[in-house]
Amino acid sequence: MPEFSDEAHDAKREMRIALLAARRSLSAADRAVAAAAVQAELVTLVRRLRPARMSAYVPVASEPGGDDLPDVLRAALPPDAELLLPVLRDDLDLDWAPYTGPESLRAAGRGLREPTAPPRGRAAVAGAALVVVPAVAVDRRGLRLGRGGGSYDRALARVPATVPTVALLHDGELVEAVPTLPHDRPVHCVITPADGLVAVPGVGPGASAGRTRGS
């Protein structure tokens, strides 16, 4: 692996450790206020776009959005719409299964909660009209810092360039730049509690960190 890749990995790890520590320092009350603000902005977006299918995730621990996010989204979607949630595979790629209510979730590895319905396959996310992903940080180019497994980079690579992709953040996690590797995939927008929906169009839709707009 080239030396610059090792440096990027180290820089990512250091940034991730610092930001996750800041998340853990938030009080339960602060997390609840932030979750409510993020949910309200996302619900507004869902009601405006009215997607027939969207994908999201179940926030855990200090992740933005609150652990009731799937129920909030399901209530905001059109009655016949489908909400897909991720199922982590052994190879750290993501499969997708429909969410039908709290009783359709089970505890999974790494502290995750996943749907119990039969998975639809890794490519199911490509049929979503709105994709919501977690992130530890996102920069002004739209490039995200995740947990380090590459799961969502692989998922985002399957999403058509025209589909809106949104990362949920705490305040202070939309940053000027995150360390990147060529496989890193951007998002179109972020939602933060204070700023709401923010477009981050510095990387062309469908691009990776190795191909930025104008290059």
Predicted feature residues:
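Conserved phosphate- and dinucleotide-binding cores of soluble alpha/beta proteins
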Residues: P2-S5, L92-S215
